[in-house]
Amino acid sequence: MQGVWNDSKNAPWDSKYTININTEMNYWPAEVTNLGNTTEPLYSLIKDLSGTGAQTAREMYGCRGWMAHHNTDIWRIAGPVDGAQWGMFPNGGAWLTTHLWQHYLYTGDKAFLKQWYPVIKGAAEFYLDYMQKLPGTEWKVTVPSVSPEQGPKGKKTAVTAGCTMDNQIAFDALTSAVKASEILGVDEAERKAMQQLISQIPPMQIGKYGQLQEWLVDADDPKNEHRQIGRAHV
């Protein structure tokens, strides 16, 4: 959040990497502005997180693959921290891997894709175990799930199932893993499982204001002016 250039011994937010939009947003311009060579530090962080995040996925959720929550640091922590409105966000790792896929799309570097495929696959594989069937539907959703720092109908926060942001990050992670496996000609069985899960992700919902719903239920507050715009991912 603060980087190395700040004037505080104890920087705001501990100067950690906030990966529920902040870190990603800082790197969004890299490929499109032909500055892809600036992403190496980000890739190093992702590689480290795929290790600590595999332990978190296994021990906290009983899931394969790897994941990270909303915040990490120089020790590459992957577990939840702080309050539920921030911490119960299981998509930080998967969101970061979109930068790996974007690099391939911009460069066509198949050697790069092969090198990073295990990390891309691992982030998607987590969702195969983590996403659960929503009662009364054929959908599978993330649960627990939060829309970071947001809550329905103006409430401070709500831990729920299948926030739109979660579903779309899962869709992106699974889709890039499927496409990468097709390009590399590997993991056909896992690819089919991921394709099946993609078909069960809920479609985005349109609410009474004509808005893209933040949750599966129509509970958006049109007067919400909170600065956290992670949901802009969708």
Q: Language-model segments: which ranges?
A:
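Active-site core of glycosidic bond-cleaving carbohydrate-active enzymes
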Residues: 19-59, 67, 75, 85, ...
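An acidic- and aromatic-residue-enriched active-site/binding cleft used to recognize and process polar
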Residues: 1-6, 10, 101, 108, ...
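Short, solvent-exposed turn/loop segments enriched in Gly/Ser/Thr/Pro and often Arg
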Residues: 1-5, 46, 58-63, 135, ...
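Acidic/His metal-coordination segments adjacent to aromatic residues that form catalytic metal sites
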Residues: 3-14, 68-88, 145-163
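Short, structured secondary-structure elements
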Residues: 1-24, 59
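Short, glycine/acidic-rich hinge or "gate" loops at secondary-structure transitions
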Residues: 2-4, 115, 132-143, 186-192
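Acidic/histidine-rich catalytic neighborhood
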Residues: 122, 126-180
